[in-house]
Amino acid sequence: MPAKVLDGKKIAADYRANLAQEVEQLKAQGVTPNLTVILVGNDGASQSYVNNKKKSAEKIGMSSSIIHLDESTTEAALLEEIDKLNNDDNVHGILVQVPLPKQIDETKVLEKIAPEKDVDGFNPINIGRLYAGVETYIPCTPLGIMEILKHADIDLEGKDVAVIGRSHIVGQPVAKLLTDANATVTLLHSRSKDMDAVLKRSDVIVSAVGKPGLVTKDVVKQGAVIVDVGNTVVDGKLTGDVVYDEVSEVAGAITPVPGGVGPLTITMVLNNTLLAAKRAQQ
């Protein structure tokens, strides 16, 4: 029996419908949640991502602005722009689109965004709060993965979960969230030994490496849930880490690429922006 397809577009659409209702309730109280995105330079993919975020926010009733700065913008000028947004009570969520030009230190930029407006969850203070188990903003892709897993008909408690990739954006935070859900988590990376053995016993595999063909049918146990966060362009086509067609034959449930995790990532940006607007009223 082929795997259940975990349709990120459908899950995201349902989630956004609920967000839209909450946005309307907040607007009735005189507060319109605002997401402001800063784009430095003219990278085509980045422009597309930024426009998508703006449209998605406006579609559920939020306001959204794009601040487009020149490629030659200095680090000091960008930090000054962020400072203005930090002090603007009408702005609830601030995103700075990466990658940034080489003259700008990304770490300094993330540190500059006020933690209470850091809807990406990348400010070191918010990362620390996540691991301390206190109120914070959870990075959007890990949050989206957890939402997808709710639709996979699996109780994570006590399950063996393999997370491939240890980035601060996906791998490490999703491992923390899965641990909080009482799963037994193994975090795998390029130096891991016996990766195949770990994958073969895993009830859930989350792959977030960006290496097409990494997860094949022979390392997936029958009925396992597969979440593919890979996002690599091969011959003009978006491709995940998982060999989808063959793994679908043995998996119990699987996310496609595209149309799996991606739609949930932007949805969780909206979720965190709404949360920031609510917290600002408290």
Swiss-Prot record:
UniProtKB keywords: Amino-acid biosynthesis, Histidine biosynthesis, Hydrolase, Methionine biosynthesis, Multifunctional enzyme, NADP, One-carbon metabolism, Oxidoreductase, Purine biosynthesis
Disulfide-bonded cysteines: none
Entry binding sites for NADP(+): 165-167, 190
InterPro entries assigned: Aminoacid_DH-like_N_sf, NAD(P)-bd_dom_sf, THF_DH/CycHdrlase, THF_DH/CycHdrlase_cat_dom, THF_DH/CycHdrlase_NAD-bd_dom
Enzyme Commission code: 1.5.1.5, 3.5.4.9
Pfam families, A to Z: THF_DHG_CYH, THF_DHG_CYH_C
One Gene Ontology term of the molecular function aspect: methylenetetrahydrofolate dehydrogenase (NADP+) activity
Catalysed reaction equations from the record: (6R)-5,10-methylene-5,6,7,8-tetrahydrofolate + NADP(+) = (6R)-5,10-methenyltetrahydrofolate + NADPH; (6R)-5,10-methenyltetrahydrofolate + H2O = (6R)-10-formyltetrahydrofolate + H(+)
UniProt record similarity statement: Belongs to the tetrahydrofolate dehydrogenase/cyclohydrolase family.
Known partners and oligomeric status: Homodimer.
The protein, known as: Bifunctional protein FolD
Organism: Macrococcus caseolyticus (strain JCSC5402)
Gene name tied to this protein: folD
